[in-house]
Amino acid sequence: MRNRLRELRAEREWSQAFLAEKLEVSRQSVNAIETGKYDPSLPLAFKIARLFGKAIDQVFDDGE
């Protein structure tokens, strides 16, 4: 699943470690989500969207 996580994080000048702390996940998890190696659970996806003040479909794109 494609996502805008890296772009949104960069706009705020947040490190992966800072975002990971906010989301209560590892930095490696943030990296894996950003690179598309890991799709977040639905609760985590909603948490990410809320953190950035976006609708979930503004952060994640399933390619359809």
What positions do the PLM features span?
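Short basic helix-loop element that most often maps to the first helix and adjoining turn
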Residues: N3-K22
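Short amphipathic helical patch at the helix-1/turn junction of helix-turn-helix
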Residues: A10, Y38-D39
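Short, charged recognition helix plus adjacent turn
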Residues: E11, R50, F60-E64
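Helix-turn-helix DNA-binding elements, focusing on the entry/boundary residues of the two helices
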Residues: Q16, R27, A45
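Residues in the helix-turn-helix
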Residues: F18, S29, Q58
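Recognition helix of helix-turn-helix/homeodomain-like DNA-binding domains
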Residues: V25-Y38
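DNA major-groove recognition helix of helix-turn-helix/homeodomain DNA-binding modules
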Residues: P43-Q58
